[in-house]
């Protein structure tokens, strides 16, 4: 167990909870180590926090909470890169963009989901090859 | 940066297994065909840049706004 300084404060992170993004994320290529943090107060929003830069955290959410129809294909190369052997052992989140001081305009990036192999501890933001989704789906459009 | 001129139907090799062929030139637009192994990632640059820009925006939240956002669950 190690203590990391993160945007959400100091966190005790077990080795098993460290997710390695071998190529970082677009715009944050230098950052490799992240962890997904669940805070009771913010659920269902969770947090993808950098363990290397305490200023970086992404609000994320399970896409199927928003829309049951969300689907995408993981390419062979990504399956290989993430060492996915068992489909049941992956987790998927999408990133929320919450405009500062204007949370009603929150959007969801369904075009580039975060895929994590819970077994290998490897993660990646996958860019989907589809026109079905964009980087900016209004969160309010998912409300019933 | 290597700059070279190609005509329609001509191609270049990058390494041993990537071939880039000029298929069609029409005004300001060039149609290119790329043959490459699956392991080679091919991405339109503006798409990568769009994700990059969105990620940079996504870290600019105000933690005080979160409660407002998570409310959507109580529907």
Curated annotation (Swiss-Prot), chain B:
Query: Which keywords annotate this record?
Result: Bacterial flagellum biogenesis, Cytoplasm, Repressor, RNA-binding, Translation regulation
Note the Pfam families from the entry: CsrA
Example of a GO cellular component annotation carried by this entry: cytosol
UniProt keyword DNA repair present: no
Q: Which cysteine pairs are joined by S-S bonds?
A: none
What the protein does comes down to: A translational regulator that binds mRNA to regulate translation initiation and/or mRNA stability. Usually binds in the 5'-UTR at or near the Shine-Dalgarno sequence preventing ribosome-binding, thus repressing translation. Its main target seems to be the major flagellin gene, while its function is anatagonized by FliW.
Q: Which family does it belong to?
A: Belongs to the CsrA/RsmA family.
What PANTHER family does the database record attribute to this sequence?
CARBON STORAGE REGULATOR
Q: What is this protein called?
A: Translational regulator CsrA
Species whose genome carries this gene: Thermosipho melanesiensis (strain DSM 12029 / CIP 104789 / BI429)
């Amino acid at each position: 167990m190690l203590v990391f300084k993160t945007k959400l404060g100091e966190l005790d992170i077990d080795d098993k909870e460290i997710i390695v993004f071998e190529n970082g994320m677009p715009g944050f290529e230098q950052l490799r180590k992240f962890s997904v943090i669940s805070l009771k107060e913010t659920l269902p929003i969770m947090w993808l926090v950098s363990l290397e830069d305490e200023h970086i955290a992404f609000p994320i959410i399970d896409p199927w909470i928003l829309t049951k129809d969300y689907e995408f294909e993981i390419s062979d190369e990504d399956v290989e890169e993430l060492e996915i052997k068992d489909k049941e052992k992956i987790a998927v989140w999408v990133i929320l963009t919450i405009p500062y001081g204007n949370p009603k305009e929150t959007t969801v990036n369904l075009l580039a989901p975060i895929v994590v192999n819970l077994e290998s501890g490897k993660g990646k933001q996958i860019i989907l090859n589809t026109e079905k989704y964009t980087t900016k789906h209004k969160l309010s459009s998912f409300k019933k | 940066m290597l700059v070279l001129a190609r005509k329609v139907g001509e191609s270049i090799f990058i390494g041993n297994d990537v071939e880039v062929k000029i298929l069609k030139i029409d005004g300001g637009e060039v149609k290119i065909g790329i043959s490459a192994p699956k392991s080679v990632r091919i991405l339109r640059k503006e798409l990568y840049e769009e994700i990059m820009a969105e990620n940079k925006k996504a870290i600019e939240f105000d933690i005080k706004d979160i409660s407002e956002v998570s409310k959507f669950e109580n529907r």
